């Protein structure tokens, strides 16, 4: 007997059911299952840098619908949760929250106390930043990330993620550090990781190197400047166009296309730089664009990546003039020897790029070495995706992992790995392949920051006190994790640190992607729990945003290819962005995000999940509270329709043999088709289509079918007809609740409890075969349309006449083809009762669109 409450409500369901799910271990992973029984998910670890926004809710809901569906189909779902709590976003959050700045030169203060005004922006601004040691800074990072992670978990629970909360990790925890360091050392041993001193992209704000995958183009205002170089072979002036006149002292050559007739006579000669008087060669290179500027360009070390290519391929010297803070260095390059050149450089030294540019332009104009005025332009400039100043290129010693950027064979092998994965939607594979094909260098993984996984190496120092970079001291895997800045290598003691004949520790940390690229290994227990690893890896699903295919997805594929010679997952499910009202991506950096807590409280978690699940795979979706209102209305309707159906059906069992009425049989046949469609959609990771079709059926069920059979269900046509309606209501409601369960876990759990002892989230997914095996083979589901459309016309007539739907229809005449009339005749009694029709006349008339004429009773 169903226990239906008098006044069901959706309020408070989240706390009630989260407590029950946790207590009963509904989502606890059973690791005794075999690999073929397990569906493992490589859950994205959200960045711990403050708060989650609706974009997170959007994409994580998509993952959860798949997890819940798989669980109901009988799979044992491995669904862990991680926290990405190292890297620049976390550092910035800690820096702002506590009002501190890390100074690695300061000693550790064991008695350092957390600032009392933490989180108070006004107080921090008034007192200014406090400089702290690296270790003290890392301690503060740990304090804040623990608080943030708990807040994240609370919100995920409120949203209803069916995660096994006993299986969590943080990318900075000891286990993750050990796995990341071990993987790096194995890359190093196999020659897949290497260190080199070379030009690298550099963010002057964060003072760290940046990888190609972390770049973005931004439109910036600039200007072209025409400078006069002077031929050293009596060929007169050579005019070049540049947007970077401040790099003139770094000029090492001029280049032109070898086939450009205008400058062929200059190839092999030299030119003198204006102001600085340095002789530079004039060379040919196919990358020089005859259509750009004057067709001849200066090569500087370094203005952009093309300069790097020219420098490398033409074997040019380095004349670096920009330091790591984005200012002009103090000492002029050795090539500048003239008094005029040295005096000019002294005026630029120490200045920012902007100020140095103004200075050199003035000098050029005063010396009449510039043609005309600067010509303003807008052009794309490379930025670090988290930075706010244009990137520079500086020469530095960095660590790299091979990723196919300089190895054609590896490049093709990684593209082929994409063929081993199913992509949802399929066209996203093109983004993966295109990214790999466009790589121009290996993966730079070292960062000059503070809170991250240390690169686990030391270097020997020779007797002269020089670091011998090639003589690395490598720890044993059993010693990991280690921090070279505080740990001492075997065979040495602390007194030998930074001393001749001793050692130095590697000061760089790994890029956060270097750890996140190992999430399958971390989640599955690589090298730590081989039994778990064998049961869960390769994983079944990688859900993520389409914008980080080039970073997270690709880097994970690289690490898995190098370590396991396999693709890390079988399926890649891509979510789109959330767009603001101006159709721009929501992001913290743009300041246009909406935090989800208030939405979850206001509309309920099921309503917010409904909005999220309507976003199709890979498609950008607008933030729309209107959709949440619809979702809330749907959840309430499920409660009320379930109460009505279960109350009406009483103790009826789901016995298909009791379904004898043609309308009931047609509904169940249509339900069977829905189940087949929803199942196919979920199997293809198209949760949105499964929801759309289920919702369409549900509203037809409640608005039309229930109204049509209501009187019959109350017994107006006898016990057999009533039982047919009761059984159909029970079977349909049972299936619909299970179809809705992945999307609306709270309201479906609540209703299921009224008539079941088990959890709906462990109940079997409905199948078409179980529903149709007890039904007649030939059922015309057009009967449903004939019945509902006829009833709708009767209702419309009453509504247009501004009469109550309960008012009697004196006469209703249905004119249609014989086929249609035969269908309407099958539901004659239900139509008469549902429409309160005194006389229903059916007229056969071939070749016309069905017509319904309604005559209402006179008003009393």
Regions found by a protein language model. Name each.
Residues 99-135, 336-348, 469-497:
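Charged, glycine/proline-rich intrinsically disordered loops and linkers
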Residues 206, 276, 387-389, 461-464, ...:
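Short Cys/His-rich metal-coordination motifs, predominantly Zn2+-binding knuckles/fingers
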Residues 35-43, 65, 120-128, 153-160, ...:
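Active-site-adjacent bridging/hinge elements
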Residues 1-259, 300-334, 367-411, 437-440, ...:
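N-terminal, positively charged nucleic-acid-binding surface of large information/translation enzymes
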Residues 226, 431, 439-514, 518, ...:
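Feature 926 captures the class I aminoacyl-tRNA synthetase adenylation module centered on the KMSKS loop
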Residues 55-67, 83-84, 176-179, 237-363, ...:
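Structured ligand/cofactor/substrate-binding pocket environments in proteins
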Residues 59, 92-100, 210-212, 257-258, ...:
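Short secondary-structure boundary/capping segments
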Residues 100-106, 134-139, 349, 421-422, ...:
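Short, polar/flexible loop-turn hinges at active-site or ligand-entry regions and domain interfaces
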């Amino acid at each position: 007997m169903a226990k239906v409450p008098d006044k069901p409500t959706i309020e408070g369901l989240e706390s009630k059911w989260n407590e029950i799910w946790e207590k009963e271990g509904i989502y606890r992973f059973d690791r005794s299952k075999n690999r073929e029984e397990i569906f493992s998910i490589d859950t994205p670890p959200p960045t711990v840098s403050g708060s989650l926004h609706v974009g997170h809710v959007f994409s994580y809901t998509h993952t959860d619908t798949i997890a819940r569906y798989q669980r109901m189909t009988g799979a044992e779902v491995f669904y862990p949760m991680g926290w990405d709590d190292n890297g620049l976003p976390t550092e910035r959050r800690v820096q702002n929250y506590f009002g501190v700045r890390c100074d690695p030169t300061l000693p550790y203060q064991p008695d350092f106390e957390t600032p009392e005004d933490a989180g108070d922006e006004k107080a921090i601004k008034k007192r200014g930043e406090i400089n702290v040691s690296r270790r003290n800074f890392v301690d503060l990072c740990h304090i804040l990330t623990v608080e943030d992670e708990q807040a994240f978990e609370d919100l995920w629970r409120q949203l209803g993620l069916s995660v096994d909360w006993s299986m969590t990790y943080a990318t900075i925890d000891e286990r993750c550090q050990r796995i990341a360091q071990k993987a790096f050392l194995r890359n190093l041993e196999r020659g897949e990781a290497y260190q080199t001193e070379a030009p690298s992209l550099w963010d002057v704000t964060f003072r760290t190197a940046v990888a190609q995958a972390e770049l973005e183009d931004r439109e910036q205002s600039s200007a072209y400047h025409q400078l006069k170089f002077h031929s050293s072979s009596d060929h007169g002036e050579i005019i070049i166009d540049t947007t970077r006149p401040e790099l003139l002292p770094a000029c090492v050559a001029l280049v032109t296309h070898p086939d450009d007739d205008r400058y062929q006579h200059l190839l092999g000669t030299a030119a003198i730089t204006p102001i600085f008087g340095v002789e530079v060669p004039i060379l040919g290179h196919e990358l020089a664009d005859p259509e750009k500027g004057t067709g001849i360009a200066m090569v500087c070390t370094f203005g952009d990546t093309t300069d790097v290519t020219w420098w490398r391929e033409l074997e040019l010297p380095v004349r670096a003039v920009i330091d790591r803070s984005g200012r002009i260095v103090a000492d002029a390059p050795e090539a500048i020897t003239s008094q005029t050149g040295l005096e000019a450089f002294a005026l630029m030294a120490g200045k920012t790029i902007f100020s140095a540019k103004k200075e050199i332009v003035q000098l050029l104009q005063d010396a009449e070495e510039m043609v005309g005025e600067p010509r303003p332009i807008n052009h794309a400039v490379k930025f670090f995706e988290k930075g706010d100043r244009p990137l520079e290129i500086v020469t530095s010693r960095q660590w790299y992992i091979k990723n196919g950027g300089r190895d054609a064979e590896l490049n093709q092998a990684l593209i082929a790995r994409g063929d081993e994965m199913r992509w949802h939607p399929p066209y996203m594979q093109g983004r993966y392949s295109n990214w790999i094909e466009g790589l121009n260098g290996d993966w730079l993984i070292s960062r000059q920051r503070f809170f991250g996984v240390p690169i686990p190496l030391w270097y020997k120092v020779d007797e002269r006190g020089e670091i011998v970079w090639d003589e690395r001291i490598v720890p044993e895997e059993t010693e990991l994790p280690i921090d070279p800045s505080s740990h001492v290598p075997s065979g040495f003691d602390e007194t030998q640190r930074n001393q001749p004949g001793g050692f130095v520790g590697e000061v760089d940390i790994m890029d956060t992607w270097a750890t996140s690229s190992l999430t399958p290994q971390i989640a599955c227990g690589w090298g730590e729990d081989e039994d778990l690893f064998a049961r869960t890896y390769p994983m079944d699903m990688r859900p993520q945003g389409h914008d980080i295919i080039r970073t997270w997805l690709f880097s994970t594929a690289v690490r898995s290819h190098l370590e396991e010679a396999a693709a890390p997952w079988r399926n890649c499910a891509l979510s789109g962005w959330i767009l603001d009202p101006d159709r721009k991506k929501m992001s913290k950096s743009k300041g246009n995000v909406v935090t989800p807590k208030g939405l979850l409280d206001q509309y309920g978690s099921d309503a917010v999940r409904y909005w999220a699940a309507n976003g199709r795979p890979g498609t950008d979706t607008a933030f729309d509270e209107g959709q949440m209102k619809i979702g809330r209305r749907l959840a309430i309707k499920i409660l009320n329709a379930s109460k009505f159906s279960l109350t009406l059906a009483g103790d009826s069992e789901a016995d298909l043999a009791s379904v004898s009425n043609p309308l009931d049989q047609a509904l169940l046949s249509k339900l069977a088709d829905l189940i087949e469609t929803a199942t196919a959609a979920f199997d293809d990771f198209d949760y949105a289509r499964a929801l759309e079709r289920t919702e369409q059926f549900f509203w037809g069920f409640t608005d039309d079918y229930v109204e049509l059979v209501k009187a019959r269900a109350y017994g107006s046509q006898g016990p057999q007809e009533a039982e047919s309606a009761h059984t159909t209501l029970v079977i349909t409601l049972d299936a619909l609740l299970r179809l809705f369960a992945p999307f609306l876990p709270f309201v479906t759990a609540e209703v299921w409890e009224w008539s079941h002892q088990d959890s709906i989230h462990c109940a079997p997914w409905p199948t078409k075969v179980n529903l149709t095996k007890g039904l007649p083979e030939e059922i015309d589901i057009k009967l449903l349309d004939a019945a509902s459309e006829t009833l709708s016309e009767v209702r419309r007539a009453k509504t247009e006449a501004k009469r109550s739907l309960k008012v009697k229809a004196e006469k209703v005449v249905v004119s249609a083809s014989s086929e249609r009339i035969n269908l309407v005749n099958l539901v004659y009694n239900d139509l008469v009762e549902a429409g309160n029709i005194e006389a229903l006349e059916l007229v056969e008339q071939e070749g016309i669109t069905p017509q319904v004429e309604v005559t209402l009773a006179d008003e009393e």
